[in-house]
UniProtKB/Swiss-Prot annotation:
Function of the molecule: One of the primary rRNA binding proteins, it binds directly to 16S rRNA where it nucleates assembly of the head domain of the 30S subunit.
Keyword match Amino-acid biosynthesis: no
Protein name, per record: Small ribosomal subunit protein uS7c
Main location: plastid
Assembly and oligomerization: Part of the 30S ribosomal subunit.
One annotated GO molecular function: rRNA binding
Top-rank taxon, per record: Eukaryota
GO cellular component: chloroplast; small ribosomal subunit
Keywords: Chloroplast, Plastid, Ribonucleoprotein, Ribosomal protein, RNA-binding, rRNA-binding
Family: Belongs to the universal ribosomal protein uS7 family.
Record organism: Cyanidioschyzon merolae (strain NIES-3377 / 10D)
Alphabetized CDD domains for the sequence: uS7_Chloroplast (cd14871)
Subcellular location: Plastid, Chloroplast
Keyword Ribonucleoprotein: yes
């Protein structure tokens, strides 16, 4: 796959294209693109800062550094903490942002997505809670790290 294929045309950002892919449902990419662009436009109107910069800030806040993987050792299953690769971390962050945006009350997905990105960039919201929960699980199971 070429670089051109994974970069959003109007925003010139790979992160925006990845967000569009995560919002995408039932192959309706133009609808997903419209939702993401409207959400980024709302963020720009709200705080006079680039929506793409706010999205990057939100993803860096939500991106997990460690996660737990189930590992079977001698009949017992342990939750073993592991470092998260950068690409996986970005995907998890975007997945969580979209999931918790969907769970918000409200009518328009663009409004809910804009609110979740805004909250994530400022260290609040459901996606941040999910990251903290993941880190707590890894910390609690640190004793099993040698099972990697």
């Amino acid at each position: 796959m070429t670089d051109q294929g994974m970069t959003d045309q109007s925003m010139k950002s790979r992160l925006v294209e990845l967000l569009i892919v995560h919002v995408l449902r039932k192959g309706k990419k133009s609808l997903a693109r419209r939702i993401v662009y409207e959400a980024l436009k709302r963020i720009e109107e709200r705080n006079q800062q680039s929506g793409v910069l706010m999205l990057e800030q939100a993803v860096s806040q939500v991106m997990p550094l460690v996660c737990v993987k189930a590992r079977r050792v001698g009949g017992a299953t342990y939750q073993v903490p592991q470092e998260v690769k950068p690409y996986t971390g970005i995907n998890n962050a975007l997945r969580w942002i979209v999931k918790y945006a969907k769970d918000r009350s409200g009518k328009s997905m663009a409004i809910k997505l804009a609110a979740e990105i805004w909250d994530a960039a400022h260290g609040t919201g459901g996606a941040i809670r999910k990251k903290e929960e993941t880190h707590r699980m890894a910390e609690a199971n640190k004793a099993f790290a040698h099972y990697r």
